[in-house]
């Protein structure tokens, strides 16, 4: 089975550890997958939309082109991401906000969240706040990701090696809650009816090892424990372990995606 050693694209409202410039340069997969999903929805131009976990704002800006007679706002917990988004897309509305703890006192036609929800610890509270921003008939569209077991094992084993373990003393790993995809339960308890739940793979081929390296370097949360120099070494060793595990230098990664569609009752 292929595993994804570089799976950490689902972010931006829970952990403020990514370098926004690096992430923006190495997040094509996230953007293209989200854009493809949006294009399938054929959103009417007069809809009001909120993008939860908007990150650098690139996909929020794309949404703004779809709702020219409506409106869109992007929210994210990471203030550096919001600062970047405001500077890069000055005609789009962005706000620093943690969906786990607060919601906007406004009702939206559509709520979207791309590659964000798995990183949220308190998913039930988040669904509750999402529901409060929806009116009867409002739609919720989510793309998320499932963490592959061998992927987790490789990273955990690397952190336990003698030359790395001192960097991770008392480290709280996000792996503990990443695979919680009980979205139907959280939605139902929040007044949102599940309309669709699908798990599927999207293959993505990186052009070379350096691209794969940069992708990991941009978004792997464990790197926040390390100096810049050590981060480069950590990723190099991680990729070496990965290629050794699969038995080849295969740059095609199968990302396992969760699609959830819900409607406010």
UniProtKB/Swiss-Prot annotation:
It holds the Pfam family Methyltransf_31. The keyword Manganese does not apply. Residues 1-17 form the signal peptide. It comes from the Viruses. This is Putative methyltransferase 235L. Coiled coil: none annotated. Keywords: Methyltransferase, Signal, Transferase. Its EC number is 2.1.1.-. One of its GO terms (biological process) is methylation. Belongs to the methyltransferase superfamily. CDD domains: AdoMet_MTases. SUPFAM superfamilies: S-adenosyl-L-methionine-dependent methyltransferases. GO terms for molecular function: methyltransferase activity.
């Amino acid at each position: 089975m292929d595993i994804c050693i570089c799976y950490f694209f689902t972010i931006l409202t829970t952990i403020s550890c990514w370098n926004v410039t690096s992430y923006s340069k190495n997040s094509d997969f996230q953007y293209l997958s989200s854009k493809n999903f949006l294009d399938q929805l054929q959103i009417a131009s007069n809809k009001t939309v909120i993008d939860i976990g908007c990150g650098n704002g690139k996909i929020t800006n794309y949404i703004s082109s779809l709702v020219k007679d409506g409106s869109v706002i992007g929210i994210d917990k990471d203030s550096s991401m919001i600062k970047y988004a405001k500077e890069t897309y000055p005609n789009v509305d962005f706000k620093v906000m943690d969906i786990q703890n607060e919601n906007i006192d406004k009702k939206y036609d559509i709520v979207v969240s791309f590659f964000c929800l798995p990183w949220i610890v308190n998913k039930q509270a988040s669904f509750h706040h999402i529901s409060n921003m929806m009116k009867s008939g409002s739609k919720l569209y989510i793309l998320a990701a499932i963490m592959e077991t061998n992927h987790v094992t490789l990273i955990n084993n690397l952190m336990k090696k003698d030359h790395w373990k001192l960097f991770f003393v008392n480290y709280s790993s996000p792996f503990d809650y990443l695979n919680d995809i009980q979205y139907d339960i959280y939605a139902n308890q929040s007044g949102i009816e599940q309309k669709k739940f699908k798990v599927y793979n999207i293959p993505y081929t990186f052009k070379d090892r350096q691209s794969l390296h940069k992708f990991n370097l941009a978004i792997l949360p464990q790197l926040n424990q390390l100096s810049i120099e050590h981060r480069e070494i950590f990723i190099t060793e991680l990729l070496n372990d990965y290629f050794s595990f699969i038995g080849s230098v295969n740059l095609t990664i199968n990302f396992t995606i969760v699609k959830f569609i819900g409607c406010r009752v």
